[in-house]
Amino acid sequence: MDERLLGPPPPGGGRGGLGLVSGEPGGPGEPPGGGDPGGGSGGVPGGRGKQDIGDILQQIMTITDQSLDEAQAKKHALNCHRMKPALFSVLCEIKEKTGLSIRSSQEEEPVDPQLMRLDNMLLAEGVAGPEKGGGSAAAAAAAAASGGGVSPDNSIEHSDYRSKLAQIRHIYHSELEKYEQACNEFTTHVMNLLREQSRTRPVAPKEMERMVSIIHRKFSAIQMQLKQSTCEAVMILRSRFLDARRKRRNFSKQATEVLNEYFYSHLSNPYPSEEAKEELAKKCGITVSQVSNWFGNKRIRYKKNIGKFQEEANIYAVKTAVSVTQGGHSRTSSPTPPSSAGSGGSFNLSGSGDMFLGMPGLNGDSYSASQVESLRHSMGPGGYGDNLGGGQMYSPREMRANGSWQEAVTPSSVTSPTEGPGSVHSDTSN
């Protein structure tokens, strides 16, 4: 079939913008007898056809410059042309010939495994799908893995985790909704174009479905990026709130004060008993294992850098001495028997509560009750703080060379006289 459909022929069979051109003699738009009028082309067949092709190409190049009204008018003229069915049948024949190659390229592509992993993770974390409390389940699992009971601090952290996870979920769903809306709008636009073109050229329903799948595959890159960023945000949130290996949290200031006070008041033997650990754990609001770990770390740090902790030891020693003297003035109970811990011996001042001040004698014996009373009266109402001066309460010489702990030596500010063990004087010469 040599006929080509360009539009309704102009009146009088002349050459128009849209006409039905035929290469056969006597065809529309060509004078009878064949060839060019008057034999201008020397009887060469096809000369007029080359000119027609040039006109067609020129019209195609000017399509973009046409207004909407002009385009609608030419589309209507094409649909109403008497040769439209013939043109459509030719296009269907061509479509059947090329249909095999199109069908061979329509193989279903497998789902991206990375996208499947992202979807599974978002479902497990409670971000994707219906809200089922995935954040609460993750928080409970992390609490169980980190050691059992949920402390108030942990409950606050889990509440923060759930609120931030809900915020991530809200952002994810809002962005996913925008993505789906844009994808649906573009798909609808393309489907409308294909339906409009199906009036001119044959477009099968399967081809429309294939085009929709291509559009979705193009948009899937945006979807994958959104899910990837959401998964990264969830992982960062988990590592910050629920990871058991995260950076340890420091104790409260009050708990640290209590532990340091006990450590420096028992510097000669900083190994609290199980009863003392339980008491300290109750005071600090922590577990017994945390108390044990704190004392173990504190002993190691103190041995490694005694000079650095000497000033801190003096501060807590003064606090302990002041608390002891204030307790002695407020209560008049008799002093307790000397403690037998350590080789040097020590005595306990009554009224000191849980804090004890170990003060061995120079000869290795413990002070008697009369010596304690004499020492207390020699201190005067000013307490230890007035009589200690600038001397150090605890000396680095308290530890043996092999790293083991022993009883503290007599403080430099309190010395035993040489004339006899019956009296104790305060030495403020330093």
Curated annotation (Swiss-Prot):
SUPFAM superfamilies the record matches: Homeodomain-like
Phosphoserine sites (modified residues): S136, S151, S159, S330, S395
One annotated GO molecular function: chromatin binding
Primary location class: nucleus
Expression (tissue specificity): Ubiquitously expressed.
Residues spanning the signal sequence: none
Family: Belongs to the TALE/PBX homeobox family.
Domain PBC residue range list: 48-243
Alphabetically ordered keywords of this record: Activator, DNA-binding, Homeobox, Nucleus, Phosphoprotein, Transcription, Transcription regulation
InterPro entries: HD (IPR001356), Homeobox_CS (IPR017970), Homeodomain-like_sf (IPR009057), KN_HD (IPR008422), PBX_PBC_dom (IPR005542), TALE_homeobox (IPR050224)
Function: Transcriptional activator that binds the sequence 5'-ATCAATCAA-3'. Activates transcription of PF4 in complex with MEIS1.
Protein name: Pre-B-cell leukemia transcription factor 2
Gly residues bias spans: 13-48, 380-392
CC annotations in GO: chromatin; nucleus; transcription regulator complex
Organism this protein belongs to: Homo sapiens (Human)
